[in-house]
Amino acid sequence: MESVGDPRDGPSTERAFEGQPVPPWTEQVTLRAVVASVALGVALSSVMMNLVFTSGIIPSLNISAGLLGFFLLKAWTRLLDQLGSPGRPFTRQENAVVQTCVVACASMTYSGGFGSYLLAMDRKTAEKTSTGDDSSASVSEPEFGRMMAFFFLVSFVGLLAIVPMRKTMIIRHRLTFPSGSATAHLINSFHTPHGARQAKRQVSLVLRSSLASLFWSIFQWFYTGGPNCGFTSFPTFGLSAFNRGFYISLNGTYVGIGMISPHLINVSMLFGSIISWGIMRPYIRSKRGIWYDADLQETNLKSFSGYKVFCAIAMILGDGIFQLVAISLRTIHTVRHHQVAAETLRSFSDVDAMPRPVMSFDDRRRTQVFLREHIPSTFAISGYVVLATVSTVVIPLMYGQVRYYHVAAAYAFAPVLAFCNAYGTGVAETNFSAQYNKLVILMFASWIGIKNGGIVGSLVICGIVSSIVSTASDFMSDFKTSYLTLTSPRATLVSQVIGTAMGCVVNPAVFTVFHHFYEMNPNKTYQAPLAKIYRGIAVLGAGGLELPKYCLAISATFFVLALAVCAMREVAAHGKWRAEPYIPSVTGMAVSFLLVPAVSIDMCIGSLIVFLWNRNDKLGSQVFGPVLASGLICGDGLFSIPYALLARYDVTPPICIRFLGRVQNDKLDAFLASKAKAG
């Protein structure tokens, strides 16, 4: 494998901190850091849970966690100073510990499958998709106690699986881990005089945008006293387009996600919405009663929903398989290139004039600190074996659809997937955990079979693998942050363990609130598109579904098109074509098949804001754009818990604003007039 190094030109970062001693790891994990992490972990877990239930798209909140952690602890130390009892100085290492702990807690909403495999197990999803697979063996209700026990069993294994590889990835191959590096540079900048002033402006912006988004959500709620009511149902492009889902809802969450997501993803989603909701949906609906039973509900996978869901699955699988093959070939090529280079160097080993890489001051200091506090590999390996053994015994008792050999097989190959995923994340921030999840579901659903509970069984195994693979890549990214901020690896491990333990309790509790009012109707707020995809894959793999007419042929066509588009993107990138930035993302298009087009339109509005901001003030856009986006997402997400509780206890908004066509309005006026005369 070739080394991917950090750029060493330019001013030294560590020279600015040379006079500051690096505190021992026991002083980096402090009580105030843990308290701040708990507060931020609960808040961001609620925000992330709102995202997995609405769009299924999860942006990185690392920057938000680092920024808010800096704000809380800085305010804490300032308050103590004013009270005359100053505490220990607030260091960048403590800031990194808070960021690691918070992200470990909040990211479990995705790796824990709360909007995907876990939700796909329940009876409500089975009934809404109506595939005839809602027997007791094919459903499993998400109970709080069982969820918490399951996550305590599987969530810590991913940490131990990747610990032995930290030196190889961070020191030897110098993988960049873009997200971890960006977070580290941000934290480093906070703790310089200029960076502290800029951080104050960023904190002010995130608070103001969060409050604005929160109050906008509250204001909108008062006018949603019925179906299709409120400003979110404004027929921006006319009633005909509105009936097909094309309108602007100005949802703070989606606009914020659009500001963070690449332009290509947002435009790809809009393109996919036009294909699925604008072209494919009306055509297939015209075949109702011919291709599928007209008496079935649209959400039934044997009716219209089957075309929509399985076309999306085909595209996602096509993209995933292509990317897995591509990264495997790249890895083999890189290994061979490294071996050839090593042999060449050995053949010239007697030549003293060979150029040798010289480490910069920053690299020397960071490497020294990173290697100083050792985490024994024997501890990690033995811990993995012990936890895997316990899980192999206990999980079949919790879920009767799986056997001990299914669990053992998952734990046997999961570390390989974890390494591959962490390596891809380190090179180019390419996280393939979702693709691994889908392949695992297909394999184990086929192995277990529909009669033996293959649907739930494969989803449980998916949960085990997902927890290991996703956690491992996130943890290695945190190691990169700790390397660049001179944070002890032991402090990083301890903070990750604390954050994971928090997530095992906080996320099931938050999920329980959301699950009470979860609706699968695509016109409702909580669409949970990934739950339908994951259950559809499990049903397909287990062989328990008869698809509607021509569904398989149409899905196969989309699968081939996905491979073609992926191949075109690869060739364009290799050949440096000018058209390469305009080739759409397959997964972006696929996700939009299961979301109303209003989501992709709002995300494109976010993209447009960033584009115009970049043209006016590129530096300001780069510094404050992600902060503004995070504020919009957090503000709207914070209202999700009160919204859930209001819906849970049937509290109805007092006003309904609805937009009608002229003909409908005339009929309504005539009806009201007749009622008035009769009265």
From Swiss-Prot:
It is a multi-pass membrane protein. It is found in: Membrane. It comes from Oryza sativa subsp. japonica (Rice). Residues 1-21 are annotated as: Disordered. GO terms for molecular function: oligopeptide transmembrane transporter activity. This is Probable metal-nicotianamine transporter YSL18. Belongs to the YSL (TC 2.A.67.2) family. Residues 1-17 have a biased composition (Basic and acidic residues). PANTHER family: METAL-NICOTIANAMINE TRANSPORTER YSL18-RELATED (PTHR31645:SF14), OLIGOPEPTIDE TRANSPORTER YGL114W-RELATED (PTHR31645). The gene is YSL18.
